[in-house]
Each structure stands twice: as structure tokens, then as C-alpha cells.
């Protein structure tokens, strides 16, 4: 998710002030070590803030399997942090060095860490453009370096002389298993990385299309709690039930796939973001939504400028999203009860923030909590998107 410079400055200020709570999703490893539901909720909430500075998630498991067909490819995804983010393997450079990258549907470009398995000096196809870049991901400290051009492939689909940021900073993760970020957002949205924009260097999917590797700039993302599938340049009909519904992509101006719908009857425009854990909107809009729900106690934090809800775990309300009136999706019980406080109370997977612009009173971000229930087809050269139940 990207915003204007003005909006980002305010958000980065909040993020920088909140560094006492680590944004590093290596702390999701702490989920396995017995971190409380309250701490986990705060970590995930801080990631929502970090998304507005292009936040990502470290901690990576095993490799991915690839199925390549003419005109496209399908890749198995690795679930990260208990189904809150998803990773894929990429091969970079003339030696095809393998780097594990997090899929980020809210960021257009790619980032490769200097301490990953990729070494520019060992790749005969590498070119250091000398063009500087800066990308703030987690604390606001930032990742900076130079933009490199080299071959990058996923699932056997190679983008030649692909532009990515090469950085010695690790403001996106201290986890050595994660070597980069692979942006998947649509082109043309607000872009505050001028080094890429000034030269017309686009993201991975658009580059594949421009170079004739795929016929259509598109991907299908099917996320699951224990993995998932990414299809590039094609659609895998086995990944969904029933029919794919074709809808107007109301998130295109934001670089997302998005649709109009309702959450428990309240109208919103939903922006799909694989890098966000739950649901996020502006402070006032989320507060009003929660106040309208029976049995919900508001939890407000002035320091972070955040609001969420606390409920009895045994009387958990339902979150039902209507997808443009075509079908309904109910968030799963494991998602709704993920933030168990251990005293019979649970925090809800929804966040409101004062630093989110007014447009996010109507535009709400929906992440993995919703996307785990659907299969989404995002088309770059169309004003439409497609979606179906898994």
C-alpha cells in the first residue's frame, strides 16, 4: 500500500515513535513461543501501520514447487507466520541464485538484500545503474541503496534486466531466511520511489508482459492458511469453487484489486492486500463500526492513535463480507479467535488508525483474513477483476 509523501510522513512519524514494539515478524516465531494474544494483536496492528510505509513480513519456511505451462506458470506458496503472509522462491542473476521473497500485492517494485544469496559481483548479467533509491518499510529507518538490473525468474518465467532495489539495510527484516520482497501491485498508482518511476522501470508482472514472456499481465492469487498458489499469466480453474465473478476493479487507482461490498451490511470499497493481516480503515470509521456491534468493548490507544475491539471469545461476533452482492464470505473461526487474551477475552482482527487518510473511511483494506477464503484474479490491463470462493 502506498500513499502520497504527505500522508507517508505522518505515518512514518507514528511508526518511528512505536519502535518499542518490534515490527519484525520474526516475532511471529514468538507466536510459537507463547506470545500472548494481546502482544500478537499489537504486532499485527503495527504491521498495518507499517503497510503504509510498504511493510512486509519475515520468517520463511520451506521452498516452493513450480508447475510451468506455455504462456504462464503456477507456483506453490509458503505460508508465513501462521497464514499471515506468503513467500515464493525467485532465481536472480546469471548463476540463478535462489532468493526467498515475500509476495506483496501492495507494492510495485522488488527489493533484494545484500546479505541474501544473490551476489551482483558474481552475476555476469548484473548492471548497477547507479540510480539511488529509498524505501521505508518497517521502522521508517529505511532501505536505501542503488537500483540494479538483472534477470529475475519465478516459476521459470524470466524478466530480463529487471530493475530492483539492492540494499545493505535490513529495515524490512532481520530474518536471514528472507532475502527480498517481490511487489505484485498494479502499475500507475502513487509511487514515491522516483528512481524507478523516472526510468519507467515497472514491477515483475508488467515487465514479463512488456518483454513478451506472458500474453496478459495478470496473476491469480489463492492464499491458504498452510500455503497457497500463485498463477502468473493464466488462471487455474481448480483453485476455486463455482464460477469466477467478474467485477469492476474499484481498487485500481490505489494499485490494488478491489471491489465494492459490505461488512456486516455496512458499505465499503475493499482493497485487497496480501501484506495486511486483518481489516484496516480510518480511526473514526472503524470505531463507529465497532460501536454498532453488540458485546464489543472498544480498545483505544492514544499513543498509536489506534482502535480495535475486545469481545468474549465464547460469544464471538461474525464478520461477513458481501462481495458486490455476488456471494458472501465469513471470516473463519481461527482468524476471529487468533488474538485470545487468555482470560476469556479476544481482540478482533480489525484496526482503525488516526493516521490513515479520510479516504479510508470508505476504502477499507482487507488482507489475509479475507483472502484465505477466496481466489483472486488481478488483471493489469483491465478495469475489471475476478474473484470466487476457494
Curated annotation (Swiss-Prot):
Pfam families: Asp. Glycans are attached at residue 62. Induction: Expressed on human skin of healthy people and patients afflicted by atopic dermatitis or seborrheic dermatitis. Its main location: secreted. It comes from the Eukaryota. Residues 86-388 form the Peptidase A1 domain. Residues 1-20 form the signal peptide. One of its GO terms (cellular component) is extracellular region. Disulfide bonds join 313-346. Keywords: Disulfide bond, Glycoprotein, Secreted, Signal. GO terms for biological process: proteolysis. InterPro entries: Aspartic_peptidase_A1, Pepsin-like_dom, PEPTIDASE_A1, Peptidase_aspartic_dom_sf. The active site is at residues 104, 273. It is found in: Secreted. Residues 21-69 form a propeptide. PROSITE patterns: PEPTIDASE_A1. Belongs to the peptidase A1 family. Probable inactive secreted aspartyl protease. May promote an inflammatory immune response in the host when the host skin barrier is breached. Has no detectable protease activity in vitro on fluorogenic substrates, a peptide library, or with the general protease substrate casein. The presence of the enzyme also does not affect the activity of the secreted aspartyl protease SAP1. This is Probable inactive secreted aspartyl protease.
